[in-house]
């Protein structure tokens, strides 16, 4: 007979999925009515006005799933829920009024500080091959705040093609769910699955050709959710490789952001300057269709996620080897697609010199 908790989780998953499937068309009409729409531009791939704010449907689905699962009684859920509500309101206002980056950052900072004030933080750091552990002390507070704010924005940075951010979030959250299941962490498993179900329900309307965009309402909420779930998994103890796992789960947006910064520095552009050279843009410029570009990035995200799962139980040397291979893998993709520019190919140049010597 199935455990009662597992039955609740399955019911919560179904409730979240059905809620979003039903509510998304309503959210779409509301977005159009209030003018929360995305205008076409030369930096964007869509050529018509699109309703934003789809993240509101995801949020409503998550709330429905949480209520169905009964996990709202958990002690840490109050602060997490308040933070999620603030992030959703922030996203809705941004989708409608295009808030400044400074305003968004300050509000996210406030949410992160509120979460940390409840005691949910990383208290010490340990390295597997050293016996001594390093107490973070007062540094636990800024590091945890940085973690929450950084990951909250990570999904927003990759939200450039139909279904891309939603699909990558599902892949990342599924990885967290698998790890939570293997570790017997019911709260993380339950939250992960209701967010997955809600995002899948939204993806039905968001995959190419999209009928609605998630907007900052969705990307910020999904980023916030992943930051909290990964933090719950790291709670108190942070090891060298445990902190790498959520970074690998978010490998695609982190990789894309890192190379965007390198690109803008080398091209002498402001770091915050928008451009059309993100990985999804480069894949399309490479000749891939909109849908195929998304699927290729899904595959990359899947590779990262499988690597994260293997890392969880790998030896130190295998962990280092996997991380090294992932770095080389992403560097090759960056050079092949011209992610920085056509001249930035250090690995290719090194390989050619090596071949000539032999």
Curated annotation (Swiss-Prot):
Residues with site note (Could be required for catalysis): 159, 162
Record's bilayer topology term: Multi-pass membrane protein
Keywords of this entry: Cell membrane, Cell wall biogenesis/degradation, Glycosyltransferase, Magnesium, Manganese, Membrane, Teichoic acid biosynthesis, Transferase, Transmembrane, Transmembrane helix
Pfam families named among the record's database cross-references: Glycos_transf_4 (PF00953)
Designated name of the protein: Probable undecaprenyl-phosphate N-acetylglucosaminyl 1-phosphate transferase
InterPro entries listed in its UniProt record: Glycosyl_transferase_4 (IPR000715), PNAcMuramoyl-5peptid_Trfase_CS (IPR018480)
A GO cellular component entry from the record: plasma membrane
Cellular compartments annotated: Cell membrane
One GO BP annotation of this record: lipopolysaccharide biosynthetic process
Transmembrane segments: 10-32, 53-72, 76-93, 105-127, 137-157, 164-181, 186-205, 218-235, 240-262, 292-311, 316-338
Catalytic activity: di-trans,octa-cis-undecaprenyl phosphate + UDP-N-acetyl-alpha-D-glucosamine = N-acetyl-alpha-D-glucosaminyl-di-trans,octa-cis-undecaprenyl diphosphate + UMP
Site (Important in orienting the substrate): 94-95
Assigned protein family: Belongs to the glycosyltransferase 4 family.
Taxonomic path: Bacteria, Bacillati, Bacillota, Bacilli, Bacillales
Top-level taxonomic group: Bacteria
Cofactor: Mg(2+); Mn(2+)
Job of this protein: Catalyzes the formation of undecaprenyl-PP-N-acetylglucosamine. Involved in the synthesis of anionic cell-wall polymers as it mediates the initiation of the linkage unit formation that appears to be common to the two types of teichoic acids attached to the peptidoglycan of B.subtilis; may also be involved in teichuronic acid biosynthesis.
Taxonomic source organism: Bacillus subtilis (strain 168)
EC annotation from Swiss-Prot or TrEMBL: 2.7.8.33
CDD domains associated with the record: GT_WecA_like (cd06853)
Pathway in which the depicted protein is active: Cell wall biogenesis; poly(glucopyranosyl N-acetylgalactosamine 1-phosphate) teichoic acid biosynthesis; Cell wall biogenesis; poly(glycerol phosphate) teichoic acid biosynthesis
Chief location of this protein within or outside the cell: membrane
UniProt key word Manganese: yes
GO molecular function, one term: UDP-N-acetylglucosamine-undecaprenyl-phosphate N-acetylglucosaminephosphotransferase activity
């Amino acid at each position: 007979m199935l455990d009662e908790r597992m039955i609740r989780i399955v019911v919560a998953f179904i409730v979240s999925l059905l809620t979003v499937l039903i509510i998304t068309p309503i959210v779409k009409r509301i977005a159009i009515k209030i003018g929360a729409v995305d205008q076409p531009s030369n930096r964007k791939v869509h050529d018509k006005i699109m309703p934003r704010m789809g993240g509101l449907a995801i949020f409503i689905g998550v709330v429905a799933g949480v209520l169905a699962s009964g996990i709202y009684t958990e002690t840490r859920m109050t602060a997490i829920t308040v933070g999620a509500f603030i992030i959703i309101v922030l996203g809705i206002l941004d989708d409608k009024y295009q808030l400044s980056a400074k305003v968004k950052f300050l509000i996210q900072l406030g949410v992160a500080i509120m979460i940390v004030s409840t005691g949910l933080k990383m208290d010490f750091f340990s390295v597997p091959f050293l016996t001594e552990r390093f107490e973070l002390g007062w540094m636990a507070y800024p590091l945890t705040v940085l973690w929450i704010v950084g990951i909250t924005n990570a999904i927003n940075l990759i939200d450039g093609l139909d279904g891309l951010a939603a699909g990558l979030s599902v892949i990342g959250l599924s990885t967290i769910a698998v790890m939570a299941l293997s570790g017997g962490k019911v709260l993380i498993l339950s939250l992960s699955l209701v967010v997955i179900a809600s995002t899948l329900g939204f993806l039905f309307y968001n995959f190419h050709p999209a009928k609605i965009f998630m907007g900052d309402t969705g990307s910020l909420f999904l980023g916030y959710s992943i930051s909290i779930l990964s933090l719950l998994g790291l709670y108190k103890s942070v090891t060298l490789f445990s902190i790498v796992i959520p970074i690998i789960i978010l490998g695609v947006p982190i990789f894309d952001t890192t190379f965007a910064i390198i690109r803008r520095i080398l091209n002498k552009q402001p770091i915050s300057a928008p451009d059309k050279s993100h990985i999804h843009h480069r894949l399309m410029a490479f000749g891939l269709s909109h849908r195929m570009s998304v699927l290729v990035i899904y595959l990359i995200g899947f590779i990262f996620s499988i690597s994260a799962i293997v890392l969880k139980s790998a030896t130190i040397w295998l962990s280092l080897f996997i991380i090294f291979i992932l770095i080389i893998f992403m560097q090759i993709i960056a050079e092949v697609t011209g992610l920085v520019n056509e001249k930035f190919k250090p690995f290719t140049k090194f390989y050619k010199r090596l071949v000539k010597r032999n």
